[in-house]
């Protein structure tokens, strides 16, 4: 990407697609269908979210929608229980996936399908790369793991709750600075990814310990000073390697080898002819009504 000094007014937008569509699916309980009986609730809500993005980022220079591939990776090797509790994608969502991908294509969003890496690590790598190049970088996701990346150039946007996580918002919501998010989640645990925390440590205790000692290394060095059952459980979690493993699971990679060129991350104009046909097929009259007369 270009020189830092050239990019300070330009935005890079990275979309965590599976996070968005799962939240769209569960957030819209009205099981919409088209005339063929195909469910469309997640598709409809995802498109509504996509419609907002160009207005949110008027200086969007590059963007990418990243789809998870579902393959095994180093985290599964490190802990076979990682995400093991997750149920298969609901059938009502499975049947919508081809249409969701088609909507992204027709609307002109560049896409990347993760294969041997998690989408989170690809997004983490691109965010770090674009932030270092001086771009204002925005990750569209409700996944709290991304908050570890937040800095003066990287923000996380939770579109479902209309929250922009900059450094101050991370501190407000989690009680710790972004640089301590990995340690915070390792103490607390992350049920969404089946990552173990320390028994008896809740969000307030995790934040208190990290703010008091300043880092996980400092907590390790001073673990004998932590009293009560919490101290006992922390010492046990250090001794059996649980904390170290949890931190490895939570830490996003920012060095994934990617062969993307600038042109691979440029949004294209919507194909209006295809879009009209798509909306008719899906029975999306509200989107058709927004179209200029052709």
Task: Please place each PLM-identified region on the residue numbering.
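Acidic, divalent-metal-coordinating active-site segment for phosphoryl/phosphodiester hydrolysis
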Residues: 144-145, 204
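Noncatalytic, basic helical substrate-engagement surface that gates or grips nucleic-acid strands
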Residues: 2-137, 146-155, 159-164, 244-245, ...
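Conserved RecA-like ASCE P-loop NTPase motor core of nucleic-acid helicases/translocases
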Residues: 137-143, 283
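Non-catalytic nucleic-acid-binding/docking modules located in mid-to-C-terminal regions
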Residues: 4-9, 57-61, 153, 164-294
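Conserved residues at beta->alpha junctions
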Residues: 16, 141, 161, 200, ...
